[in-house]
Structures are given as structure tokens and as C-alpha cells.
Curated annotation (Swiss-Prot):
BP GO terms, sorted: DNA-templated transcription initiation; nuclear-transcribed mRNA catabolic process; nuclear-transcribed mRNA catabolic process, deadenylation-dependent decay; positive regulation of nuclear-transcribed mRNA poly(A) tail shortening; positive regulation of translational initiation; RNA-templated transcription; transcription by RNA polymerase II; transcription elongation by RNA polymerase II
Quaternary structure annotation from Swiss-Prot or TrEMBL: Component of the RNA polymerase II (Pol II) complex consisting of 12 subunits. RPB4 and RPB7 form a subcomplex that protrudes from the 10-subunit Pol II core complex. The RPB4-RPB7 subcomplex probably associates with TFG1. Interacts with NRD1 and PAT1.
Gene3D superfamilies according to UniProt: Nucleic acid-binding proteins (2.40.50.140), RNA polymerase Rpb7-like, N-terminal domain (3.30.1490.120)
Keywords carried by this UniProt record: Cytoplasm, DNA-directed RNA polymerase, Nucleus, Transcription
Cellular-component GO terms for this entry: cytoplasm; nucleus; P-body; RNA polymerase II, core complex; RPB4-RPB7 complex
Protein name: DNA-directed RNA polymerase II subunit RPB7
Amino acid sequence: MFFIKDLSLNITLHPSFFGPRMKQYLKTKLLEEVEGSCTGKFGYILCVLDYDNIDIQRGRILPTDGSAEFNVKYRAVVFKPFKGEVVDGTVVSCSQHGFEVQVGPMKVFVTKHLMPQDLTFNAGSNPPSYQSSEDVITIKSRIRVKIEGCISQVSSIHAIGSIKEDYLGAI
């Protein structure tokens, strides 16, 4: 699910960057460090909103090397998946144990135990696929998956998905 979240980040700035364009440099550094990153607590930070209203607090000089530390407050669009959420994605790998679906920046693994009984793995096809009388699920197939559980790590989020219910599976 997508959220708008108020966040903050401490940015350390070397003295060589002190000057009239310091705020511009801090904003650029914020975008480089934050956009596309993942925090286990908030999820994937997709983009920073309202670039002109990023709040840069007063800096604090660090006693060790003369660098300054700034607390930068900003608003961002965040993607955080939840158990029970239904998402669309693209199959990126397929094996006898299940297949993996890319949903934005996150990967969802669908094990064969969470697929309908009539889907069978066909290793002889190129590329490998799951087939039934109605559907074929192979690499690059568009698929609708229900998230059964999420695993948050420091720099990524992985999920387990199911296509066993109605209206789930190949699109």
C-alpha cells in the first residue's frame, strides 16, 4: 500500500561544501540517499514530495573534523506491503518449488502449495512454466497475487504470496 509519510534524515556535510549553494547540495544529497531506498520500518521510499519545502534545520559542527550535521525533514511517498493485500506483478523466475513475482521494488514468492491444484510445473517447456487447462504462468507473465506474509529486512522486503483464491493468478 502507498502512504505519504513525514520523515527526517541526518546528513553530514564536509566543510568544502559550505557556501551559498549549501542548501541546494543538501537537498540533492537527500534525494540521492533516500529515493529508491528501503527501511524495514517504513518500507520502500519511492520519491520525495514538495522539493521546495524540504525543511533543513540548523547545522551542528562536529568537533572531530569540522563537518556539519544537518537534520533534514521531508515528506515522501512510501510503499509498504501488508498481509492480505492483493497486488499485480510480473513473474521473474519459475522453478519446481514455485515462482517469484516482481511487484514494484519487492519480490513475492508463490510456493506450489499456495497455487490451485490443477496448476502443474512443466520443466520441459522453454522457459519453464506452470500450466493448467486454462492458464499458463511463465516468465514475464502478468499475475495477481495475494500477500500471505511479509519479511522485512534492513534493505529489502520479501513476501510470500498465494494465487489459490478466486480472481487471483494470470491476468
